[in-house]
């Protein structure tokens, strides 16, 4: 899940800790670039924080700790879910600004 906050609540941390095996953070520019790429490739526009969840498998594939943590057999049965909500609540003119920012960052 992409949390648009600096720190999740301690209550949430306690509730999900049995199910959590890792966490990461992304810079905003990464999420804006992903927003533009997803819009161009799939026609989906999500708010930037929703894109954070999509990058997890990329980080896992690059990290030797995670590579040793999950066997190829386990990975072949894995399902990665992204909590991709929020795009429909963003005003169209704001979403267009997000998209334009992502495109600009991709072209730098």
PLM region descriptions:
Residues 54-108:
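Phosphate-binding loop/pocket of nucleotide- and phosphate-handling active sites
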Residues 7-75:
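Active-site-adjacent helical/loop segments in soluble small-molecule enzymes
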């Amino acid at each position: 899940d992409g949390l648009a906050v600096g720190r999740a609540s301690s209550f949430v941390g306690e509730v999900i800790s049995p199910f959590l095996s890792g966490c990461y953070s992304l810079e905003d520019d990464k999420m804006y670039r992903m927003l533009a790429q997803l819009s161009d490739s799939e026609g989906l526009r999500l708010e930037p924080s929703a894109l954070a969840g999509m990058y997890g498998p990329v980080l896992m594939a690059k990290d030797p700790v995670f590579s040793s943590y999950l066997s190829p057999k386990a990975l072949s049965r894995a399902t990665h879910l992204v909590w991709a909500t929020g795009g429909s609540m963003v005003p169209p003119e704001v979403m267009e600004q997000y998209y334009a920012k992502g495109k600009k960052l991709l072209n730098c």
